[in-house]
């Protein structure tokens, strides 16, 4: 058995991980307080629970679809010398400014528009952040560093979130109204994200790149076209990206829709927030554990285990009707969320050329964001089409929202089958 050794992080690796701590504060807010805040705006605007869940799902779908379109283009452009850091910084600033601006919007529609812009900035920045990984660390350390990014992102993002949660829950004790508390929460998160980005901007230097070769814009589209052709010929990469499209769909959809799902089912708001806070604490050690497991066990095997466990989690969520079940769901998600994300990222990083990481991670982003578009859209559509209906399954009365979540089971199953084929082919090639 291989001995697992602790590694000492370099300054660049620490700076890279710190960005995960910064942007994770935003996504934690998106998965907890923001859906509840939008619910109050939607209720004031006359929307019922099913329409609220549908419009929230559609907003997530629009943002992910936009990133799926622009991500590969920007990723390929960023592979040119000197382009990666400036484009990364621009996307980060769009997310930070959008986050800060969400607190000053009037009405549910304006809020959704600003939310989409902030989510596009966040998701786009991750294309370049992920593409930095092969330059930030070595191939041998990639699984561990990737896992630590997610792990410390989960636990570090709790710091600003607790401040925001205390302000929202108890702000009235010090004369701060609910609306003002949310405005301040958006500002706290935006500042945290911006500050945590600065060390990476200072230390990162693009070491793997392609030369401009003329106009970088026209070269970008030419190389993107060539990459699509190459991926179709490299069956092991093509199958992996196709599998990733499906299995990561369920992961991202659960992250995006968890609070909205619980709110639509009428579960206690405070209980939902505390349960999702628990997810962060559970995800921290479990993400690190998966990074260490990858030194002893095959990465492909670990990803397969995560996919199967997520399939079981989704089946459990279909029958969720009470608060305690949501707490169990939160713990189960925390156990596997960071592992499957980190290992999927490093798995691709090991089978692609480092100097073209931007374009390949851009393609990965098409798959990830395109999948998230599929998942949130399916849930939104099923929820809207079955508005007001209830279903009796195994003696339980389930709401239409429960049935909508069940669509993810099929998507996980397809992803598992495709990944098994891709991993078998990758093992043959290596």
Regions inferred by a protein language model and the residue ranges of each:
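Juxtamembrane intracellular "pre-TM" segments in multi-pass secondary transporters
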Residues: 2-13, 205-241
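Helix-loop boundary and gating motifs at the non-cytosolic
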Residues: 6-64, 236-268, 272-275
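A membrane-interface helix-boundary motif in multi-pass transporters
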Residues: 49-50, 168-190, 381-412
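Helix-to-loop junctions at the C-terminal end of transmembrane segments
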Residues: 69-82, 285-299, 383
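Structural signature of the two symmetry-related core transmembrane helices
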Residues: 86-100, 301-316
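Helix-loop junctions at membrane interfaces in 12-TM secondary transporters
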Residues: 102-115, 318-330
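Glycine-rich segments within core transmembrane alpha-helices of 12-TM secondary carriers
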Residues: 146-168, 367-376
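Multi-pass alpha-helical transporter architecture, strongest
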Residues: 192-203, 405-430
């Amino acid at each position: 058995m291989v001995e697992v050794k602790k590694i000492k992080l370099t300054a660049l690796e620490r700076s890279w991980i710190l960005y995960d701590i910064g942007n994770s504060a935003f996504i934690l807010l998106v998965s907890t307080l923001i859906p509840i805040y939008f619910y109050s705006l939607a209720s004031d605007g006359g929307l019922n629970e099913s329409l609220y869940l549908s419009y929230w799902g559609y907003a997530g779908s629009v943002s992910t679809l936009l990133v799926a379109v622009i991500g590969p283009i920007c990723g390929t452009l960023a592979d040119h010398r000197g382009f990666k850091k400036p484009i990364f910084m621009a996307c980060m600033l769009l997310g930070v400014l959008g986050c800060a601006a969400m607190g000053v919007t009037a009405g549910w529609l304006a809020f959704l528009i600003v939310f989409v812009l902030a989510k596009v900035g966040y998701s786009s920045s991750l294309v370049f952040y992920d593409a930095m990984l092969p330059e930030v660390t070595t191939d041998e350390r990639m699984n561990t560093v990737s896992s630590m990014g997610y792990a410390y992102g989960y636990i570090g993002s709790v710091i600003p979130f607790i401040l925001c949660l205390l302000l929202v829950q108890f702000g009235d004790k010090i004369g701060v109204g609910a609306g003002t508390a949310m405005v301040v929460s958006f500002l706290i998160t935006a500042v945290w994200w911006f500050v945590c980005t600065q060390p990476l901007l200072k230390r990162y230097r693009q070491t793997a790149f392609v030369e401009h070769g003329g106009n970088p814009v026209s070269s970008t589209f030419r190389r993107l076209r060539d990459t699509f052709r190459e991926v179709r010929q490299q069956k092991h990469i093509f199958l992996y990206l196709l599998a990733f499209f499906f299995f990561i769909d369920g992961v991202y959809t659960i992250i995006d829709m968890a609070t909205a799902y619980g709110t639509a089912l009428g579960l206690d708001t405070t209980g939902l927030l505390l349960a999702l806070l628990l997810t962060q604490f559970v995800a921290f050690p479990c993400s690190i554990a998966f990074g260490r497991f990858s030194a002893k066990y095959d990465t492909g095997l670990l990803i397969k285990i995560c996919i199967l466990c997520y399939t079981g989690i989704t089946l459990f969520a279909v029958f969720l009707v009470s608060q305690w079940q949501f707490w169990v769901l939160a713990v189960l998600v925390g156990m596997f969320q960071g592992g499957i994300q980190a290992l999927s990222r490093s798995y691709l990083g090991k089978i692609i050329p480092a100097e073209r990481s931007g374009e390949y991670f851009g393609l990965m982003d098409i798959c990830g964001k395109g999948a998230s578009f599929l998942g949130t859209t399916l849930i939104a559509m099923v929820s809207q089409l079955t508005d007001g209906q209830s279903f009796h399954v195994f003696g339980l009365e389930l709401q239409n929202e429960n049935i909508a979540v069940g669509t993810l089971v099929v998507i996980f199953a397809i992803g598992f089958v495709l990944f098994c084929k891709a991993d078998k082919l990758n093992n043959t090639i290596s």
